[in-house]
Each structure stands twice: as C-alpha cells, then as structure tokens.
Amino acid sequence: MDAVEPGGRGWASMLACRLWKAISRALFAEFLATGLYVFFGVGSVMRWPTALPSVLQIAITFNLVTAMAVQVTWKASGAHANPAVTLAFLVGSHISLPRAVAYVAAQLVGATVGAALLYGVMPGDIRETLGINVVRNSVSTGQAVAVELLLTLQLVLCVFASTDSRQTSGSPATMIGISVALGHLIGIHFTGCSMNPARSFGPAIIIGKFTVHWVFWVGPLMGALLASLIYNFVLFPDTKTLAQRLAILTGTVEVGTGAGAGAEPLKKESQPGSGAVEMESV
C-alpha cells in the first residue's frame, strides 16, 4: 500500500478504506447468519391454534438453524451471529474493537430484517407477539437475569472450546448447535430462552414491545463476559502480552490464520500455544 502523509486526510481515508475492505464480507455474513437464525428459530415459537409448538420442537429448530448458520458463514466471519459471542471474543483478545462494533451493528440489523420477514409471512392472528422473549410471571427479573447468564455462559464456553485452534477434531457447527438446544430445553420456561440479545431485539423492535427487554441484554452479556474470562484466563490462559492485546484491540494485528474475514493485517503476530481462536482482527 502506498505511503500516505501522516496526519492528513489520506491517512484517515486509508484507514477507512482498509477497515471496510477487511470486514465488508464478514459484516454481510453476520447479517445473514443472524437474520436466518431469527427467521427460522423464532418461527418455530409461533403458536398455531392447531399445532402448539413443543419445547423439544423449538430446541431442535434452534439447534438446526444454529448449525446451518455456523456452517454457512464460518469461513467468512467466524459465525458469531450474537452480540454476546462478539463481546466474549473481544474480551478474549480474538477480535478488534472496530470489528466488534461493526459485527454487533450487522447482527442487530440482520435480526430486525429476519423478524420483519417472519412478521410479513405470518397470518395476523399468529404474529401478534412474534415470539418475543418474556419473563414468566412467577420468575423475578433477578432470576431471569441469572438464568440468561448461566445459559449464555455454557454457550460461550462451548463456542470457545469448539473454535479453539488447538482442537483437532469435532464440528463447531454441530457442537454449538447442541449447546443452543440445551439452553432452550432449560431456559424456555423461564424467559423463552434468549442467550442472544439480537434474537430478542429483532422481534421486539418489529412489534414495539420492550417489557423488561434489558434482561435479555444484561444476562447474556454478563454470561459471555464471565465465560470469556474463565476460558481465556483460567482454563486455557494464553501468552499474549499487554502490548499484543492492545494491538489486537485497536486492530493492528491479526489473530489466527483460519476462519477470518479476509483482512490484510498491518502486522501478523505468531503465538504458538496461545490458544487464539481462528479469527482475524481488523
């Protein structure tokens, strides 16, 4: 890349162009994965008068759509499709802050589009609540937050374990799908099982109902944060220095060599045994 005068407009333009080139494909992948997840997953929750959905049916559907979304978008973006997962990768120094912000934006837009499409194809008497997450009357908001925290904790731990570059066997799509199904089998009676703020956000914004919506952000994000700390600093601590973590945070270093988004790194750090997930930073 040609040199650009530091401090000038050219420098800012170069950074903006470089950032967009690095993540545009990944942003579409996150948009697509989250949209599909919401359309098919939330679609399984719709209460048809002649065939009410069972918990098992809902869990299996979320399992299958998760596995599909991960398989389809894995090589393009790392298949987060979940702001909580993106936060966990950010905290674990597997992804830069600019990429994380862009991912979350793409996920929320994808979830909204997926929910809008579902709303559009559903009959009027079926789509009234559009499968929004709600806290059961007998469950307090504190209990709901705790449940969402624990459900997301196990999901994010599974995501890290499944995508760790040191893993030589197993299918991330299969294992992450199973983890999502597990969460639904337990959590659906408490909160409808979110584990994913985007999943809750899309339907809520389409029908305009945000009752205790904060629960479905606070619980999953806290669970993701805790899972990232446990996996990256307790179970499998890596050797990254503070300087390396700051470089990753700001997007000046590439992490991993596998399922990235096609970034051309300013600098590539090799860290054998660091446990870096196969994910590129901007």
Swiss-Prot record:
One Pfam family named in its UniProt record: MIP
Reaction(s) the record says it catalyses: nitrate(in) = nitrate(out); iodide(out) = iodide(in); bromide(in) = bromide(out); chloride(in) = chloride(out)
Annotated motif NPA 1, positions: 82-84
Intramembrane segment spans (from-to): 79-88, 193-205
Complex formation: Homotetramer; each monomer provides an independent solute pore.
Function according to Swiss-Prot or TrEMBL: Aquaporins form homotetrameric transmembrane channels, with each monomer independently mediating water transport across the plasma membrane along its osmotic gradient. Unlike classical aquaporins, AQP6 is an intracellular channel with selective anion permeability, particularly for nitrate, and exhibits very low water permeability. It may also facilitate the transport of gases, such as CO2 and NH4(+), as demonstrated in vitro.
Protein name, UniProt field: Aquaporin-6
Lineage: Eukaryota, Metazoa, Chordata, Craniata, Vertebrata
